[in-house]
Amino acid sequence: MEIPYTVEPRRDTGLYNAKVGIWLFLASEVMLFGALFSSYILLRVGADIGEWPQGLLNVPIGTVNTLVLISSSVTVVLGWAALKQGNFAKYRICQTITLLCACAFVGIKSYEYYDKFTHYQVITKDGKVFDGHLVSKNKDQVVLHGFEIDASKGKAAGVTAAHKASHGGHGKEIEIKTAEIQKIGNYGPAHNTYTSIYFTLTGLHALHVIGGALVMGYILFPGAGMWKTEPERYTNRVEVSGLFWHFVDLVWIFLFPVLYLL
C-alpha cells in the first residue's frame, strides 16, 4: 500500500508527511530545552550576590564551537540546494563537511568535559580551599597545580580567580596530605548547581548533535541508493534531517551566551 503525501504536500497543511512530523517533534524539543533554560535562569537570578560561579568556562573554545556549528548549518543548506539542482556530488561534499563539523564539535566538547573532570577543589580540615588541575593522587597525598582560593574576595569570586589563573598555566604545585583533607571533588556534575545544569544542558545538546550526525550519515552513505530510484523523496529526507540540524544549531546559539558569557 502506498502512503500518500510522502513527496507531495498535503492539501490541508501544505507540507508533506515527514515535514509535518519533524515540526511536531521539534515543538516537543522546544518544550524540553525551554524548561531547562527556564530552570537555569531561575537558579541564576535567585542566587545570592557573589555566590553564582562565573568565568569557569573557556570562552574562546566555546566561540570556536559556535563557529563550527554555524558553518555546519551553512553546508547543510548548500547540500540540500545541490540536490534540488540534481547535483549529488556537490551534496555529498557539503554533507561530508557537515559531518566533519559535527565530529569537531563533539571532540571540542569532550575536551571541555575532560578539563572539568580533571580540575579539582580541595577543602582542608583547617578551612583552606585549593583549586587546580590534578597532578597526582594517592593514599598519602593529593598534588594540584593551582592556587589557594582567596576567601576575602568572596567564595564565587575566589574560585573564579583561581580557576582562570590555573587555566592560564599559572599557579604552582600544591601538595596536600590526605589526612588533612575534609572534602575533595572535581568540577563534574555533582560539584554544585552550576556545573550540574551545565552538564545537563550541554550533555543533552551533545546527544542531539550525535543523533543528528548519525541520521545524516545514514542518509549520505547507506541510504544514498534512494537518490537513484526516488530522488525527490531522498531530497525530502535530507531536508527533514536538515531542519533538525538547524534546531540543534539554534539551541547552541542560546546556550553559548547564557552559559559562557552571562
What residue spans do the PLM features occupy?
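...captures the hydrophobic TM-helix bundle architecture rather than a specific catalytic motif
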Residues: M1-L262
